[in-house]
Amino acid sequence: MTVPKKHSVSLLVTDVDNTLFDWLAMWHTAFSGMMAEIVRISGIPQSELEPEVRRIHQRHGSVEYSFLIEEMPSLIAPGMTVKEVRARYDPAVEVYRSARLALLKPYPGVIDTLEAVRKRGCRIVAYTESLRYHTTERFKQLGFDGLIDYFYSPGDFALPSDRADLPARRAEAQASLAYTIHRTTPPGEMKPNPRLLLDLIRETGGDPARTVA
């Protein structure tokens, strides 16, 4: 895409993960800590757990699948209910959450740059392959709500059928952004994708000739 002159730019399209914040460091640190705690609680070597983890991540198409632990066969003892599995490994989940919150910060200069772009009258669209729930939660903590006009992402994975509390919690989280508008990308779409990029530019009222992406 041709980069227009600075004075004519009306739309900025940006990636999110590892562009606006260090997703890899956050996820790797949080996930490694969680796995270490799972090993401690279960007594099962990590090398035996990792193949199960990979299969579950592949099945759900995300390394941030929230219900990983309760689907790992090695962690479900005979006669153990899913609720009991959750309770036993809740300390591991807390390790993950604590590390994620501690590390989730914008790269230096990101907030100032987004604010400067908006002051020039330029709209900002973010496009990520991370799922909607996780991205919404991150936008709130990172301070992106209101700085970014739209964010495009896939939807969310299916919720466990035994968790009647989760649909309301997910709906609350999805509606919790005060200003930024979410739009869902079609299933299976991956980056780079020039056609999808053009679609989201047009959907947000942009002009490809006046867009930086």
Language-model features, listed with the residues they occupy:
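Pocket-edge positions in alpha/beta enzyme catalytic cores
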Residues: 57, 98, 102, 185-189
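Residue-level signal for well-ordered alpha-helical scaffold segments within enzymatic catalytic domains
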Residues: 33, 37, 112, 116, ...
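Active-site neighborhood of HAD-like aspartate-dependent phosphohydrolases
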Residues: 2-52
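Short, acidic loop-to-helix structural element flanking the phosphoryl-transfer center
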Residues: 7-8, 66-67, 94-140, 194
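A metal-dependent, Asp-based hydrolase signature
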Residues: 40, 54-98, 116
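An amphipathic alpha-helix signature
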Residues: 27-36, 65-73, 132, 136
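Substrate-recognition "cap/lid" segment bordering the active-site pocket of phosphatases
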Residues: 125, 131-212
